[in-house]
Every structure is written in structure tokens, then in C-alpha cells.
């Protein structure tokens, strides 16, 4: 399926955005918990 240039599947968008959001929240909480939140 090379026809994903103009139409990206919704499940792919949801998976990517969900992973990014969870990753950012995890990094933020981990950084603030370990005392590195102020350096971000």
C-alpha cells in the first residue's frame, strides 16, 4: 500500500500520537521525580 502519501490511516496517527504523548509524559514525570525536571 504505497497510497499513504495523501491519506494516512487513523490507527497509525492514533498509535504514533499516543506513543509520543505517553513518552513525553513519562519523560516529564521521570525527570521531575529524579530532580532533572528543572533542566528541561
From Swiss-Prot:
InterPro entries: PSII_PsbJ (IPR002682), PSII_PsbJ_sf (IPR037267). It is a single-pass membrane protein. It holds the Pfam family PsbJ. The chain crosses the membrane at residues 8-28. One of its GO terms (cellular component) is photosystem II reaction center. Its main location: plastid. It is found in: Plastid, Chloroplast thylakoid membrane. The keyword Glycoprotein does not apply. Keywords: Chloroplast, Membrane, Photosynthesis, Photosystem II, Plastid, Reaction center, Thylakoid, Transmembrane, Transmembrane helix. GO terms for biological process: photosynthesis. It comes from the Eukaryota. The keyword Plastid applies. One of the components of the core complex of photosystem II (PSII). PSII is a light-driven water:plastoquinone oxidoreductase that uses light energy to abstract electrons from H(2)O, generating O(2) and a proton gradient subsequently used for ATP formation. It consists of a core antenna complex that captures photons, and an electron transfer chain that converts photonic excitation into a charge separation. PSII is composed of 1 copy each of membrane proteins PsbA, PsbB, PsbC, PsbD, PsbE, PsbF, PsbH, PsbI, PsbJ, PsbK, PsbL, PsbM, PsbT, PsbX, PsbY, PsbZ, Psb30/Ycf12, at least 3 peripheral proteins of the oxygen-evolving complex and a large number of cofactors. It forms dimeric complexes. Belongs to the PsbJ family. This is Photosystem II reaction center protein J. It comes from Cycas taitungensis (Prince sago). The gene is psbJ.
Amino acid at each position: 500500500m504505497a497510497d499513504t502519501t495523501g491519506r494516512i490511516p487513523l490507527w497509525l496517527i492514533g498509535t504514533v500520537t499516543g506513543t509520543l504523548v505517553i513518552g513525553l509524559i513519562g519523560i516529564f514525570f521521570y525527570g521531575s521525580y529524579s530532580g532533572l525536571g528543572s533542566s528541561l
